[in-house]
Amino acid sequence: APALVVTATTNCCGYTGPACHPCLCTQTC
């Protein structure tokens, strides 16, 4: 799986849960 896709952990959007769209850490999802 692509490294930017994170599941069931603190994702790039700063919340715990399933990964959002592989966004940049500076963007809101």
Curated annotation (Swiss-Prot):
Segment forming the signal sequence: none
Maturation and modification: O-linked glycans consist of Hex4-HexNAc2 hexasaccharides. N-terminus is found to be free and N-acetylated, depending on the fraction studied.
UniProt GO cellular component terms: extracellular region
Functional summary from the UniProt entry: Probable neurotoxin with ion channel inhibitor activity.
Modification type 4-hydroxyproline: residues: P2, P18, P22
Comment on protein domains: The cysteine framework is IV (CC-C-C-C-C).
Single GO MF annotation: toxin activity
N-acetylalanine modifications at: A1
Expression (tissue specificity): Expressed by the venom duct. Low expression in the distal venom duct sections.
Stated family: Belongs to the conotoxin A superfamily.
Keywords in alphabetical order: Acetylation, Amidation, Disulfide bond, Glycoprotein, Hydroxylation, Ion channel impairing toxin, Neurotoxin, Secreted, Toxin
Cysteine amide PTM positions: C29
Keyword Secreted part of the UniProt annotation: yes
Classification of source organism: Eukaryota, Metazoa, Spiralia, Lophotrochozoa, Mollusca
Residues carrying a glycan: T7, T9
Keyword check for Glycoprotein: yes
Protein name: Conotoxin SIVC
Subcellular location field: Secreted
